[in-house]
Amino acid sequence: MNPGFVKLGQLLGKERLFSYIDKFGFGKKTGVDLNGEGEGIIFNLDKVGKVELSTTAFGQGVSVTPIQQVAAVSAVVNGGYLNKPYIVKNIVDNDTNTVIKEYNKTPIRKVISNKTSSIMRYALESVVAKGGGKSAYIEGYRIGGKTGTAQKVKDGKYMVGNYIMSFMAVVPSNNPEAVLYLAIDNPKNTALLSSYTTTPIARRILLDIIDALDIKKQDNEQEKDLEWTDKITYIVPNVVGKDKDEAKKLLSDFTIEYSGSGNKVVEQSPKAFEKIEQDATIRLLLE
C-alpha cells in the first residue's frame, strides 16, 4: 500500500499535497475546548524534497494528534466540511437550570467536494466489508473504516518493533452520525496487524455507539467478503540471553527448532524484531 501512496504523492506534487494537509487542519491546533492541545509536526514546504514528499504521502515523518485525525476524517465523510471540534455541548446554571452557554457546530472550511466525500465513504465501507477492517463488520449496519500502523519515535529515530496500531471507523457510512478513533500503544503478543488488534475492539465499541444513538439497521450495506486476504505477521521477540523455557514461552506462536547443547539461547534466526508470518519456524542456538 505504501508504494501506491508514494506514487499518488508524486502525482499530486508537494504544493498540492501539502495544501490538502493544511486544509484538513494538520500542523495546527483544532481549537478544541481542552487544555494542552498539540499542533503536531509537519514539514515546512520549502524543506520538502523527493524523500519528504514520499514519506509524507504514506504518513511517515509527520506527527498528528488524535483530535486532528478525527476532525479530518469527519470532513472526509460529512460532505467535505472541516468543523471545529468541541467537547462541552452546553453549560447549564445549576440553580436555575438555564443554559448559560451553548456550543454549536462551527464549519471552518470546505475541503473536498460532496462527490469526493461520497466516493470516500464507499471506499471506507469497502475496507470493512472486503478489506483489512472485516473484524469491525456488523451485519445490517453500514460501517466504514481504515486501519493504521505508526512506527514510534525515540530520540529522533524510529524504534524497531514499537508501533501504535489504530482503527478509524464511521457509522453509518452512508449518513455518518459518529466517528471512532481507537489506538493501542505498542500491543504485545499479537499479530502485527490492526485487523487483529484494534479492529475487533472497535467493533464492540461500535455496537455500543449504535445502541446509544439508536442507529437503525439497513439492508443495503456492502456484503462481507468471507475470504480473508491479510497475511498474519508477527514481530519476532528477542530471546537471546534467555533460558530455553523462557524462550519457549515467548515464542509460543511459532515452531521452534533447537541446535547446540545447553540451556541458554546465544543466537536466533530470524533476528529479533524482524517480521515473519504465522506458523513460521524460529531456530535457536543453545549453549
Indicate where each model-derived feature is located.
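Ligand-recognition elements built from short beta-strands and adjacent flexible loops
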Residues: G140, K154, L182-E287
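Beta-lactam-recognizing serine transpeptidase/beta-lactamase-like catalytic domain environment
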Residues: M1-Y181
